[in-house]
Structures are given as C-alpha cells and as structure tokens.
Curated annotation (Swiss-Prot):
Lineage: Eukaryota, Metazoa, Chordata, Craniata, Vertebrata
Family to which this protein belongs: Belongs to the cytochrome b family.
Gene3D superfamilies: Cytochrome Bc1 Complex, Chain C
Quaternary structure and partners: The cytochrome bc1 complex contains 11 subunits: 3 respiratory subunits (MT-CYB, CYC1 and UQCRFS1), 2 core proteins (UQCRC1 and UQCRC2) and 6 low-molecular weight proteins (UQCRH/QCR6, UQCRB/QCR7, UQCRQ/QCR8, UQCR10/QCR9, UQCR11/QCR10 and a cleavage product of UQCRFS1). This cytochrome bc1 complex then forms a dimer.
Entry's transmembrane regions: 33-53, 77-98, 113-133, 178-198, 226-246, 288-308, 320-340, 347-367
Highest taxon of the lineage: Eukaryota
UniProt miscellaneous comment: Heme 1 (or BL or b562) is low-potential and absorbs at about 562 nm, and heme 2 (or BH or b566) is high-potential and absorbs at about 566 nm.
Binding site for heme b b562: 83, 182
CDD domains: cytochrome_b_C, Cytochrome_b_N
Cofactor: heme b
Protein name: Cytochrome b
Amino acid sequence: MTNIRKTHPLLKIINSSFVDLPAPSSLSSWWNFGSLLGICLGVQILTGLFLAMHYTSDTATAFNSVTHICRDVNYGWLLWYLHANGASMFFICLYLHVGRGLYYGSYMYSETWNIGILLLFAVMATAFMGYVLPWGQMSFWGATVITNLLSAIPYIGTDLVQWIWGGFSVDKATLTRFFAFHFLLPFIVTALVMVHLLFLHETGSNNPTGIPSDPDMIPFHPYYTIKDILGFLVMLTALATLVLFSPDLLGDPDNYIPANLLITPPHIKPEWYFLFAYAILRSIPNKLGGVLALVMSILILAIVPVLHMSKQRSMMFRPLSQCLFWLLVAVLFTLTWIGGQPVEHPYIIIGQTASVLYFLIILFLMPMTSLVENYLLKW
C-alpha cells in the first residue's frame, strides 16, 4: 500500500516540499537561513498575536498599554521582548540569507530572487510600522521623519503624506492604521513566502559550487531536517540569551519616554537594522536625491542578475570577487555605524564615502572584476 503522505492531497504537497524533496548533497550552513526565517516569522506572528490582545492603538493609551503588558500580563514582558528582539533576529537572518544569495549566485533564479526582494520590502515595512506602535519618543519622531520623506515626491508628495497620516501630523489616525497594517502584513509575508518556495522548488536549490547538482541529490528528510533543527536550536538559544540577559541591548532608551510632539530627541534614528539605509539617505544633501538613494539601496538587488558577468555562478572559486564581496560587507557595517552617529564632522564625510563605495562596488567593480576573472580563466 502506498504511503499516505504520497497520496493524501494535502500531505503530498508537504511531502514534496519537506520530505522527499531532492536537495544537493553539498549544502553548507549558509542554506539554513531560509528555515530560520520561517521560524522567526512563526515566532513573530505568535508573540504579536498575544501582544495584540492587550495592546490599544490609541495615542492616549498606547504607551500605557505596553507598560501594562510588561508589568501586569502573565509573562507579558517575555512576549514583548521576544517580539522586539525577534525582529532583530529576523533581520540578522534576512541579511545573511541575502548575502548568501549574492555570494553563491542564487540570484540567477530570477523569479525566486525577485519575490525575495518583495519579501524584504514587506518585512521592512512591517518592522517600521511595528516600531511606531509603543508610541515612545523615537516611535513618534521616527514615524514623522520617515513618512515625511514621501513629501519629496514631486507634485503629489504633500497630499500623499497627509493621506498616510490621516491628518496634518502623525496622530491617532496614523497610529490606528499602522497597527492595522502591522497586523495584516505578516500574513501577506507568509503568502509571499509560499510563492518564494513555489518558485524555488521549480528550479531546485543552488549549491556552494554553483554548478548543476542533478547527478548528486539526497532527500531533504532526514539529512536537512536534522540540520535545520540544529539551526533552530542555535538561533533560539541566541534569541533566549538576548531576551533574558540583555533585552534592551538593541533598543533605543528614548523609546521608554512617552511620545511628546513638543520635544524633539537630540538624534532621531530608526532601529539598528535600518541604519545602513538611513546613512545612505542622510549622505545626500538633497531631499529627493536622498529618498531615491534610500530606495535604490535595496532595489539595486533587482539588477544584480543583469550585472552578473562571470562565467562561474558562485564566488567560491573567484578570489578577486570574494575580496570585493567582503569589502561590501565592511562598507555595510560602516554605514550601519554611521547611521547611529550625529550629523557632524567626520561622520558626514565617512557616510558619503561609504555610500559612494556601496553603489560603486555593486554597479561597477563587481562586474568589471568578473570580466577580469573570465580573462584569467583563459590562461
């Protein structure tokens, strides 16, 4: 008799995705981050659901409702800190996942890659709106500054900003709609994840060598299920350590002060995972130019497949490209650091230099280096 997992209409979909799925035998730990992102999404939806049961999206009570969750709700502090730090773990895994794709040439699966970029934008939007909900100082001023960027759009900018705000400033209407969208978006993200996996399973996984692995495949279960479980344990241990020992490490102290539209914080900045893009935004003195650079800093990923000039897919055997890749990583760390610093000398010039380098490496240096490597292959 045929196994039920191969005949049942629902189980056979799960079977072909997670059990009998043929996978390359050479996948390294860098291929763990997809499943880790799935766990992060699950943790965020669960903790968020329970937080939403106690949260009130009203400017008069939002801050107090968060305080109530932390002080009066059973294990409310744990839910709150798991959700806040879970977002940080989510972005750590996201950036490592994208970095893996860039290093090993996974962007050549263009459908999967483009859905991934959409996912990145959706998760960033979700995180931004979530940061506004506690209605602390940085929530309010962060929302004001970032939404105000849309006013740089010619002709419709001002109307668009007021439409998003629901008035002439960030107020009750803004908070209510941000809560509604923050609740809705993770489910849209979940749907996009399914599409992402659908396209991935059409082509099969890439592997570290970048060459087709059709002759050497192994079943996903038990090999990669066990490997993923180890990844879960490592990540959840890291998250638990962060939450239980240093829960405010990645947060901003200003957000423990209730929002006050009469007092501007000395330095308005977003959460750490947006600082690289924020630094690029600030490095351009023109408002519209800054907004375009901000959007392009992420959207540039969409043209990476077009810029692939190498005869080899992966960077595994391309030492010159490897050097450039790690230079790009160093530039991103520099931008993240600069984004958290005040706008003064020498941070301004460092930020501008790093921003130019970021675009220069991706748009020119990497394709040119690939052509040089192609030439060296002839020797």
